[in-house]
């Protein structure tokens, strides 16, 4: 299926559901507590991220779409933290504050990229009057192209049928991430997105693909759904619609670090794509690609348009290929969250030859990700003369980005990449040739940050200058 990204800026989506705050405490562990046989974590980093329905809204906003969020919170620090974090990414919050209940909060303690324990702070919102939520939905319907109901069984969606009816009356598609085995509650929805275990809790264990499809189709008919999307972890996802053959989308995940919030990403991207004008099949394709990206990150995460674009071009995970500096910083930060070692090198790379390819492959072996910073055309002319470069910057970067050894390619305008290196601060700075480490641009900054600097040899007798001269001699 060939799919291009829509203009997400024209999409408006309302998310209604169980909002929560995800807290993360990070730190090293080096000993066992004398009080009990448990590790001692010396916490050095604390993060707060919107979770649950709030993470769905974050995923929608990260694509550039207009995201509105309705949910139940307490009147406490967690609610204020949620509003602050969501406003930073332009999610429009319209929470119903319940003074008698705390905002749902989940605290995770992690060390060396491993989750050690999760602590939940919640009472749920059962018994809370849903009328204010109905009123907020009614007001938002004229301005949205899709309604997402994100159900974590915490109380915000206890009265879900009136919400479905309001949306269907306004001809707005209703997408639901369900919870529990009572799918009767979701009758008449446009689409349900259960994972495989949630699906089998309703229809029973499926022995094979045929059984899954048949039982899924029956579920669509029984509950008057327009479609059902079953997310199946490493087996991808399957879209079922009456009167149409099943659409199976294989997983695009290359590495799985954390599945936290992956379902939020799927329904968020799917809703944004539908609201932007994509078909259901195209929207599922994009959601599947986004899921392949987000499981390669640690914790509840979102997907940017550049990451999604790279994923549907076949380069998933954190986003690969040619990037600007801001995109590169995001990609590097995500790589570091996963504990990956980042290597960086630079050059003109005017006519890519065997020496370049060998050098870049050797540089990549020294870490997990390789950044190649490339001199702009103006920078190259200043260094090499008016007749250079032979190949313009765009072509040089595309060729470099196609190499298996290269993860990220970024241009720079200055004569040296010192400023860029100081901004990125790679774990290892590499340069080819006869340099001494202290002569390499950016070496002082990398050392000061605790990184390494290394010189690699180029293949003897192979250079761009020699190739150009040989071409000239051949023409002579």
From Swiss-Prot:
Chemical reaction(s) catalysed: D-glycero-beta-D-manno-heptose 7-phosphate + ATP = D-glycero-beta-D-manno-heptose 1,7-bisphosphate + ADP + H(+); D-glycero-beta-D-manno-heptose 1-phosphate + ATP + H(+) = ADP-D-glycero-beta-D-manno-heptose + diphosphate
Binding site for ATP: 195-198
Alphabetized Pfam families for the sequence: CTP_transf_like, PfkB
Pathway: Nucleotide-sugar biosynthesis; ADP-L-glycero-beta-D-manno-heptose biosynthesis; ADP-L-glycero-beta-D-manno-heptose from D-glycero-beta-D-manno-heptose 7-phosphate: step 1/4; Nucleotide-sugar biosynthesis; ADP-L-glycero-beta-D-manno-heptose biosynthesis; ADP-L-glycero-beta-D-manno-heptose from D-glycero-beta-D-manno-heptose 7-phosphate: step 3/4
Region (Ribokinase): 1-318
InterPro entries for this protein: Bifunc_HldE (IPR023030), Carboh/pur_kinase_PfkB_CS (IPR002173), Cyt_trans-like (IPR004821), PfkB_dom (IPR011611), RfaE_dom_I (IPR011913), RfaE_dom_II (IPR011914), Ribokinase-like (IPR029056), Rossmann-like_a/b/a_fold (IPR014729)
Top-rank taxon, per record: Bacteria
Keywords: ATP-binding, Carbohydrate metabolism, Kinase, Multifunctional enzyme, Nucleotide-binding, Nucleotidyltransferase, Transferase
A cellular component term, taken from the record's GO annotations: cytosol
Region Cytidylyltransferase, annotated ranges: 344-476
Active-site residues, as the UniProt record annotates them: 264
GO biological process per UniProt: ADP-L-glycero-beta-D-manno-heptose biosynthetic process
GO molecular function: ATP binding; heptose 7-phosphate kinase activity; heptose-1-phosphate adenylyltransferase activity; phosphotransferase activity, alcohol group as acceptor
EC numbers for this chain: 2.7.1.167, 2.7.7.70
Task performed by this protein: Catalyzes the ADP transfer from ATP to D-glycero-beta-D-manno-heptose 1-phosphate, yielding ADP-D-glycero-beta-D-manno-heptose.
Similarity annotation: In the N-terminal section; belongs to the carbohydrate kinase PfkB family.
Subunit structure, interactors included: Homodimer.
Official protein name in the record: Bifunctional protein HldE
Origin species: Yersinia pseudotuberculosis serotype O:1b (strain IP 31758)
Gene: hldE
């Amino acid at each position: 299926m060939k799919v291009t990204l829509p203009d997400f800026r024209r999409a408006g989506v309302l998310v209604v559901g169980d909002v929560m705050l995800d807290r993360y405490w990070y730190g090293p562990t080096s000993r066992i507590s004398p009080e009990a046989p448990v590790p001692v974590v010396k916490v050095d980093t604390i993060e707060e991220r919107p979770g649950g329905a709030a993470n769905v809204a974050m995923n929608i906003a990260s694509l550039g779409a207009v995201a509105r969020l309705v949910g139940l919170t307490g009147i406490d620090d967690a609610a204020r933290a949620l509003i602050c974090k969501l406003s930073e990414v332009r999610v429009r919050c319209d929470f119903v504050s319940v003074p008698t209940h705390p905002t749902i909060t989940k605290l995770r303690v992690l060390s060396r990229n491993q989750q050690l324990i999760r602590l939940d702070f919640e009472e749920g919102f059962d018994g809370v009057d849903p009328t204010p939520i109905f009123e907020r939905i009614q007001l938002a319907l004229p301005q949205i192209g899709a309604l997402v109901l994100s159900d974590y069984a915490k109380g915000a969606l206890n009265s879900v049928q009136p919400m479905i009816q309001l949306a269907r009356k306004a001809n707005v598609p209703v997408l639901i991430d369900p919870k529990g085995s009572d799918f009767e509650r979701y009758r008449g929805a446009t689409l349900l997105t259960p994972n495989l275990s949630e699906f089998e809790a309703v229809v029973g264990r499926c022995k094979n693909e045929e059984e899954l499809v048949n039982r899924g189709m029956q579920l669509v008919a029984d509950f008057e759904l327009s479609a059902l999307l079953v997310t199946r972890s490493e087996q991808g996802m399957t879209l079922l619609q009456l009167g149409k053959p099943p659409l199976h989308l294989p997983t695009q995940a290359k590495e799985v670090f954390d599945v936290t919030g992956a379902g939020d990403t799927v329904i968020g991207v799917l809703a944004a794509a539908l609201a932007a004008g994509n078909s259901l099949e195209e929207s599922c394709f994009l959601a599947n690609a986004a899921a392949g990206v987000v499981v390669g990150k640690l914790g509840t995460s979102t997907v940017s348009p550049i990451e999604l674009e790279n994923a549907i071009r076949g380069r998933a995970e954190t986003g690969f290929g040619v990037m600007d500096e801001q995109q590169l910083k995001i990609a590097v930060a995500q790589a570091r969250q996963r504990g990956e070692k980042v290597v960086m090198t630079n050059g003109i790379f005017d006519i890519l030859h065997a020496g370049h390819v060998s050098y870049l492959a050797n540089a990549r072996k020294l870490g997990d990700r390789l950044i190649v910073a490339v001199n702009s055309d103006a920078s190259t002319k200043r260094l090499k003369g008016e007749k250079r470069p032979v190949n313009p910057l765009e072509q040089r970067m595309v060729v470099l980005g196609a190499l298996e050894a290269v993860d990220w390619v970024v241009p720079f305008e200055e004569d040296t990449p010192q400023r860029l290196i100081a901004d990125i601060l790679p774990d290892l700075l590499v340069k080819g040739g006869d340099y001494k480490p202290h002569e390499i641009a950016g070496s002082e900054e990398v050392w000061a940050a605790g990184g390494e600097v290394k010189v690699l040899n180029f293949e003897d007798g192979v250079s761009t200058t020699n190739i150009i001269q040989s071409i000239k001699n051949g023409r002579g």
